[in-house]
Amino acid sequence: FDPLDTEFGAYFMNYHSRAPIFSGHGAPASAYSGAGLVGGLVGNGVPLGVAAGLAPTLLPLVVAGNSSYYVEYPEDIRLYGLSFSTTLPTGTAWSGELSYRPNAPVQLNTTDILFSGLTPLNPNVSVLQGTPGQDQQGYRRKEVTQLQTTLTHFFDQVMGAERLTLVGEVGWTPVGGLESNSKARYGRDPSYGPGPLPNNQCVTLNSGTLAGGPQNNVSRYCENDGFTTANSWGYRGRAIWEYNDVFAGVNLKPNVAWSHDVEGYSPGPGGNFEEGRKAVSLGVDA
């Protein structure tokens, strides 16, 4: 086994993202005026006392209704990569790749973006602070590295098959420059709610969202699980059997695949690993 009997590769790319980033635009300053809302209600025939009582409840709705949201596609992402490929003395093919993006756009938590438009009314509803009439960009650029290695081995005449192919892969994704979760949070599906907020605001927001529904889970996801972490890793495995000329010249390749995201949450959109996620799949190619 000659360690230099190996193919090496290096590459560089500058590309534009095809994955959409969710961003927001704050309502105009006039939408935040409680006095203006009361005046508008009175002008439409609502008694002053009633209008003043309704204003605190209606004002967040007015602000949300005058805000806007959009998707954007960040440009000029730099990608540097190194790779190798060799064959071990056992006949096992071994390959690996290291990629580095010094300015990768990472999606901020979309729930924080949504509620940031309300922070001029209540600064505790989001860890992101919004400004009336200004954009709330949905991403920040971070250093993202991806390291993966793959082993492939062939076995002939196994289980009645001409060949059995086993493939195993391990991947690791470190992210540099992440802020503490009290300053900025990345990733996590919005269906899990806002996460921890000052003054128990997470429970308050969940209670409002679930108004009229069961209230027993309002604090269940007021935690930091699910947000992008500095490290994440997992592994994949696949087995493929090759049966030639099974009938009428048809070749069949049944396969089974297994994946396990062991620890951490990768940056999005489209992160590779979500801690605890497991999947198995069966298939047949002909």
Q: What are these model-derived regions, one by one?
A:
Residues 85-109, 142-144, 148, 152-171, ...:
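Hard-cation-handling environments
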Residues 20-70, 108-136, 179-223, 266-268:
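Solvent-exposed loop segments that connect transmembrane elements
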Residues 1, 10, 82-86, 96, ...:
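Residues on the lipid-exposed face of transmembrane beta-strands in outer-membrane beta-barrel proteins
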Residues 76-80, 143-147, 231-235, 274-280:
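Residues that define the transmembrane beta-barrel architecture of outer-membrane proteins
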Residues 12-18, 100-104, 153-155, 170-176, ...:
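Transmembrane beta-strands of outer-membrane beta-barrel pores
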Residues 261-286:
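C-terminal structured "cap/appendage" subdomains that terminate the fold
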Residues 68-72, 84, 135-139, 223-229, ...:
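Outer-membrane beta-barrel proteins
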Residues 2-7, 21, 85-91, 156-166, ...:
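Short loop/turn motifs that connect adjacent beta-strands in outer-membrane beta-barrel proteins
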